[in-house]
UniProtKB/Swiss-Prot annotation:
SUPFAM superfamilies: Acyl-CoA N-acyltransferases (Nat). One of its GO terms (molecular function) is arginyl-tRNA--protein transferase activity. One of its GO terms (cellular component) is cytoplasm. Belongs to the R-transferase family. Bpt subfamily. Functions in the N-end rule pathway of protein degradation where it conjugates Leu from its aminoacyl-tRNA to the N-termini of proteins containing an N-terminal aspartate or glutamate. It catalyses: N-terminal L-glutamyl-[protein] + L-leucyl-tRNA(Leu) = N-terminal L-leucyl-L-glutamyl-[protein] + tRNA(Leu) + H(+); N-terminal L-aspartyl-[protein] + L-leucyl-tRNA(Leu) = N-terminal L-leucyl-L-aspartyl-[protein] + tRNA(Leu) + H(+). Keywords: Acyltransferase, Cytoplasm, Transferase. InterPro entries: Acyl_CoA_acyltransferase (IPR016181), Asp_Glu_LeuTrfase (IPR017138), N-end_Aminoacyl_Trfase (IPR030700), N-end_Aminoacyl_Trfase_C (IPR007472), N-end_Aminoacyl_Trfase_N (IPR007471). Its EC number is 2.3.2.29. This is Aspartate/glutamate leucyltransferase.
Amino acid sequence: MTQHSRDTPQFYLTAPSPCPYLPGRHERKVFTHLVGNKAGELNDLLTHGGFRRSQSIAYRPACDQCRSCVSVRVVANEFRTSRNQRKILARNADIVGEQRNPVPTSEQYSVFRAYLDQRHRHGGMADMTVLDYAMMVEDSHVETRIIEYRKRTPDTGITGRGGDLIAAALTDVLGDGLSMVYSFYEPGEQNRSLGTFMILDHIARARRLGLPYVYLGYWIEGSKKMDYKGRYLPQQRLASSGWIRIDASGEHPEPQD
């Protein structure tokens, strides 16, 4: 790769393929490579413009005649838990979250594999091997962390370490927030609502770090896989005019920062 291509991002468009979220539709993506010394700055800028990261690639939907994928970010400092979310936090009071460098482990892959087999056995990631998983975690040129969620043990208060791993989240640290790249959990623990718990934990982490937002990726109205992202209010959704605030009272059309 030349110096020019490292410093000046080149954007590419994928060929149409079946949409994994809305039956009968096709998706296309525009993408670029996140490499070089300014990869972090570029990732910040692109995330603010609706892109997502996957390994060293930043991508955004660019579908013909469809704008259903809407980038959403939770306003961390103003977020208030619902009654149901408070119940989920209480249900997981025995869980401790440990932030680590993005180093893949066999323990993580075991949970990841079980999660895919139970929840996404026919999805695009279903055939990922342990080497594929390692690439997903390690292939990052931006500030990335992996948050491991473990059950507390009698020694956790002393050592700060938990016991069995039951969930994990691959997370980018941006200039204005945390971006949840991918999360997974032990399917045998589904009664804990660990997906919701990890989002709530990231909102709390963003607050402690003084970061205004938690980026959740794409909200898709009418998609059972993605509709849950609309439950975390207040949030902002990216429109053609900029980020639009959504709260319990509805939509506020004035563009946000």
